[in-house]
Amino acid sequence: MDENHRNPFANASTSARASGSTSASSNSSFSSSVADTDDDQTIARILAEDESLRREGKLGKRLSHLDSIPHTPRVNREIPDINDATLDHELLSGRLATYGLAELQMEGDGNCQFRALADQLFRNADYHKHVRKHVVKQLKQQRKLYEEYVPMKYRHYTRKMKKHGEWGDHVTLQAAADRFEAKICLVTSFRDQSYIEILPHNKNPLREAWLSFWSEVHYNSLYANGVLALPDVPTRKPRRKHWLF
């Protein structure tokens, strides 16, 4: 694996200089390249300059006693019926209360996983489309890492994941962990799996992202109780949900 793939943001400025010295095949492709480079530079700048985004591992210390199960990437399973979903939601709510955690609600528009990741990484859930774009890039560039977990033609899978509103899964979570060099921590509604850690391949994580995962249906962004009331933490009311809770 080369250096660019290990850290896709480290050479953002180098990529910008290279794109300026290479003639584009068309105006549209050149514009697309510039836009991609601008996105990369923005992401790199946000991650580098705002140490508060990492929250100094406070949630990690709070839940350090929990045992995490080994993570195996997978696509989404069958969605539960409303009765099972209700029970799962109650179980998740109880766990969050026990751990002293609160959810920042994400819109249920099919982008909730990417919104939650964007909120954790950039404190802006509206940056979800850029998170999705980089996750899809990771899936394409490092196909060998993920292909065995996808039970369909891989090109079809990546084309599907590129679309706005397509639900993320545990394969995209692994790709996000790898792309952003992050440990992704899930507090779940699973009866036998309350906590899952997703670590980047062959590298130490530089940051953490804490998400709640409810019943194969929905992801939210997690904070310690009381943090969401602070003035520097964004709050939002989701416009749409998949479930009436």
UniProtKB/Swiss-Prot annotation:
Residues 1-37 are annotated as: Disordered. Residues 101-225 form the OTU domain. PROSITE patterns: OTU. Its EC number is 3.4.19.12. It catalyses: Thiol-dependent hydrolysis of ester, thioester, amide, peptide and isopeptide bonds formed by the C-terminal Gly of ubiquitin (a 76-residue protein attached to proteins as an intracellular targeting signal). Keywords: Hydrolase, Ubl conjugation pathway. InterPro entries: OTU_dom, Papain-like_cys_pep_sf, Peptidase_C85-like. It holds the Pfam family OTU. It is an enzyme of class 3 (hydrolase). The active site is at D109, C112, H218. The keyword Signal does not apply. Disulfide bonds: none annotated. Belongs to the peptidase C85 family. This is OVARIAN TUMOR DOMAIN-containing deubiquitinating enzyme 11.
